[in-house]
Amino acid sequence: MADSFSLNDALSGSGNPNPQGWPGPWGNQPAGAGGYPGASYPGAYPGQAPPGGYPGQAPPGGYPGQAPPGGYPGQAPPGGYPGQAPPGGYPGQAPPGGYPGQAPPGTYPGPTAPAYPGPTAPGTQPGQPSGPGAYPPPGQPSAPGAYPAAGPFGIPAGPLTVPYDLPLPGGVKPRMLITILGTVRPSANRLALDFKRGNDVAFHFNPRFNEDNKRVIVCNTKLDNIWGKEERQAAFPFESGKPFKIQVLVESDHFKVAVNDAHLLQYNHRMKNLPEISKLGISGDIDLTSASYAMI
């Protein structure tokens, strides 16, 4: 059969320096507008090479393995097999150009979505699950230098009087994320977060800037006016005169604490009845900007 096919023809169009569908900064992005990877061309038999091409050859101008132009991953090519979704996408399909749940091109998952720093995001501390939005997807980290805005159950950003009590109606529950924003005062001595049940303290988080000329974080629980055994943490991410973000993620059997988007410590529940923990007390040598909570 007469054919102008040659090896040069088969290799033409493979020099695209920035092929569509190549893994981007967010990992394996879906192929750009085109068909399902490996889909046949319109009217072709499954597995048949495109007209004028060699079996296994990439479409003209494309990168090997790239989906042919015109479709979205999961979408049948025009004129395809019976049962194919009409042009425009499959029911429930994400709009062209994005993967379900993916941020728009050129944007970072917004800092307004409550999130606990998670190990799935490069550069974050290990030891905690990622969550929707999180402790950041279930959480990407918030944009560098940005803090989440106050959530639907929080207090609008602005100076708050310290000591300050944040009501927690219904108590705390797993996947509740509490976010505290503020600035450490110069020559600070201490700050404290106290998750309270009446006069009891379920979780006492107490960074101390100068205890015997050392900086240390002390965690504890107070039941019936008696303090339990202290748990001490040597890592100390707070600096006098500098802003901070504290995030406390409630899990079924422990609290997780992150500071400035990095996981810091975990504290197992000593008080088991979480719904009775109805208030968060914030005190110490800080200027408090906001305190909020949200479910993630």
Swiss-Prot record:
GO molecular function: disaccharide binding; IgE binding; laminin binding
Region named Disordered: 1-150
Protein name: Galectin-3
N-acetylalanine modifications at: 2
GO process terms (BP): cell differentiation; eosinophil chemotaxis; innate immune response; macrophage chemotaxis; monocyte chemotaxis; mRNA processing; negative regulation of endocytosis; negative regulation of extrinsic apoptotic signaling pathway
Pro residues bias locations: 48-120
Gene name of the record: LGALS3
Subunit structure: Probably forms homo- or heterodimers. Interacts with DMBT1. Interacts with CD6 and ALCAM. Forms a complex with the ITGA3, ITGB1 and CSPG4. Interacts with LGALS3BP, LYPD3, ZFTRAF1 and UACA. Interacts with TRIM16; this interaction mediates autophagy of damage endomembranes. Interacts with cargo receptor TMED10; the interaction mediates the translocation from the cytoplasm into the ERGIC (endoplasmic reticulum-Golgi intermediate compartment) and thereby secretion. Interacts with and inhibits by binding NCR3/NKp30.
PANTHER family per UniProt: GALECTIN (PTHR11346), GALECTIN-3 (PTHR11346:SF26)
Modification comment: The degree of phosphorylation is higher in the cytoplasmic form than in the nuclear form. In protein isolated from a canine kidney cell line, 90% of the phosphate was on Ser-6 and 10% was on Ser-12.
Main location: cytoplasm
Gene3D superfamilies associated with the record: 2.60.120.200
Pfam families linked: Gal-bind_lectin
SMART domains for the chain: Gal-bind_lectin (SM00908), GLECT (SM00276)
Nuclear export signal, short sequence motif: residues: 272-287
Residue numbers carrying Phosphoserine: 6, 12
Regions of compositional bias (Polar residues) in chain numbering: 1-11
Provenance organism: Canis lupus familiaris (Dog)
